Amino acid sequence: MRLVACLVFLASFALVCQGQVYKGGYTRPIPRPPPFVRPLPGGPIGPYNGCPISCRGISFSQARSCCSRLGRCCHVGKGYSG
């Protein structure tokens, strides 16, 4: 009897959740960019290692490369760490 009551509860809960999802137009989670690399606009490139002197003016892929190769990672509003 408990099993039947539990199954009825779960089935009704699933139907309610499906209705909420459909009403809200929810499709899937929104992907977020990695928190360690967020390039900011404007800035020079360092002469020897190919990584910028500051986090400004570099592409996302260049910032990720500098972070993985040299441990110099850009943080929003803080510049480099490491």
Curated annotation (Swiss-Prot):
The protein's matches in InterPro entries, at most eight in alphabetical order, are given as: Penaeidin
Assign the protein's first listed, main location to one coarse class: cytoplasm
GO molecular function terms here?
chitin binding
Pfam families associated with the record: Penaeidin
Q: Does the keyword Disulfide bond apply?
A: yes
Give the UniProt subcellular location, in the record's own words. Answer: Cytoplasmic granule
Keyword field: Amidation, Antibiotic, Antimicrobial, Chitin-binding, Disulfide bond, Fungicide, Pyrrolidone carboxylic acid, Signal
Where in this protein does the record say Pyrrolidone carboxylic acid is found?
Q20
Using the record, list the residue span of the signal peptide; answer none if the entry has no such feature.
Answer: 1-19
Q: Identify residues that carry Serine amide.
A: S81
Q: Relate the protein's function as given in its record.
A: Antibacterial and antifungal activity. Presents chitin-binding activity.
Concerning its family, UniProt says: Belongs to the penaeidin family.
**What's this protein's name?**
Penaeidin-3f
Source organism per UniProt: Penaeus vannamei (Whiteleg shrimp)
